[in-house]
Amino acid sequence: MMGITDIETDGTVVGMDVSKLELVGFADREQEQFSCPNSSGAIRRLGKRLAKLEPKLVVFEASGGYEGLAVSIFTEIGLPTAVVYPKRVRQFAAGLGVMAKTDAIDARMIAYYARVAKIQPIPPHSGEL
């Protein structure tokens, strides 16, 4: 059984909650909340800002494809990204007694879930078949 001392604490994990119109994020080590419109230019600016944090992982909750643009852009600029199932994040949050559901809370829970579950980034595309 994993104990609290087994949870890695090195590097920042960023949780991203995505909707059609907006991305809401949370950087766990910095305890920083942020948001931006779900548009190419805004996502690129956010990606550059996040790159300065040198995150070990940026995690998106699957949201019917609304996360696709951000995942693509973040991967392109070299940020380690992953996508997780919403049901698992909700079960994790419920296990912690967090029943409220807002974009800000979701982003925080995504980051915490990714750290505890040791989610790994999507492998970079090599360009080879």
Say what each PLM segment does:
Residues 1-129:
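Phosphate- and other anionic-substrate recognition elements at nucleic-acid/protein interfaces
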